[in-house]
Structures are given as structure tokens and as C-alpha cells.
């Protein structure tokens, strides 16, 4: 049986909307937006296969509704950064790094994990985006 939030983030990404009923959300998700108006996490999600978007979207929704939540779904990375940990088909692992800002979950960076530890360049990029703001 699937999770209760099947495909909702995928639908929002596809339709370029993310303002769903947030009345029940404890930590509504927002995409980081660069000064140029780009939303790197949304772009990354759109490039993934539909089943991967669905899995990651369900995990983000779980965090939105159950925050604060810990392992195995969410882990603190320090410096105000957190990661949503998603297991994809074929043994692949995805991570979405976020920060908490003004009562929202700001999605800063997403990637497919290929090493045991989170690469420093991914952490540095997320931290740079956090410092820039853009929520």
C-alpha cells in the first residue's frame, strides 16, 4: 500500500504550483530561488524519472506534515541544514538538503548520492544558497 501523499509534489512540479492547502502542514516546503529566478531543486526534480519524483515528493510531504521528524527520513547536517533521505529503485539514494526559514522548509539542493558521505561540494552549495536566502 502506498503512502498517503502519492504524487502530490510531482503534480505540483508538473503544473508549476506549490501552493496547496497548507493548513495542516507543520513545515510547508518552498523551493530556493536564485537572484536570476531559477529554482534548482524544482529543475532537478523535473529531470528525474516520474517514479523517482513521486518517491522524493512523498518523503518531502511526510516531513511537511510530521515536522520535527528524525532518522531514518531526516538527518541534521549541521549549520542549520537538514537532509531528506529518499531510497529510490535500483538501490539508488537521493538527498534533498533544506533549511528552516520563517516557518518553512526551503529546498536548497537535491542530488543522487554516489558515495557513503555527503560530498563537501554539495554541502557547500546548499550552505551558499542558505546564506543567499531566496525562499
Residue ranges and their predicted role:
Residues 1-93, 101-105, 112-135:
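Basic, Lys/Arg-enriched alpha-helical interface segments
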Amino acid at each position: 500500500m502506498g503512502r498517503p501523499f502519492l504524487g502530490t509534489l510531482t503534480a505540483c512540479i508538473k503544473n508549476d504550483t506549490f501552493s496547496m492547502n497548507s493548513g495542516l502542514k507543520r513545515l510547508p516546503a518552498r523551493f530556493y530561488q536564485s537572484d536570476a529566478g531559477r529554482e534548482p531543486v524544482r529543475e532537478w526534480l523535473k529531470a528525474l524519472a516520474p517514479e523517482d519524483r513521486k518517491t522524493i515528493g512523498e518523503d518531502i510531504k511526510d516531513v511537511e506534515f510530521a515536522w520535527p521528524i528524525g532518522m531514518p527520513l531526516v538527518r541534521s547536517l549541521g549549520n542549520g541544514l537538514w537532509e531528506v533521505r529518499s531510497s529510490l529503485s535500483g538501490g539508488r539514494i537521493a538527498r534533498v538538503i533544506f533549511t528552516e526559514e520563517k516557518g518553512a522548509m526551503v529546498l536548497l539542493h537535491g542530488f543522487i548520492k554516489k558515495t557513503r558521505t555527503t560530498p563537501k561540494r554539495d554541502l557547500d552549495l546548499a550552505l551558499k544558497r542558505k546564506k543567499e536566502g531566496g525562499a
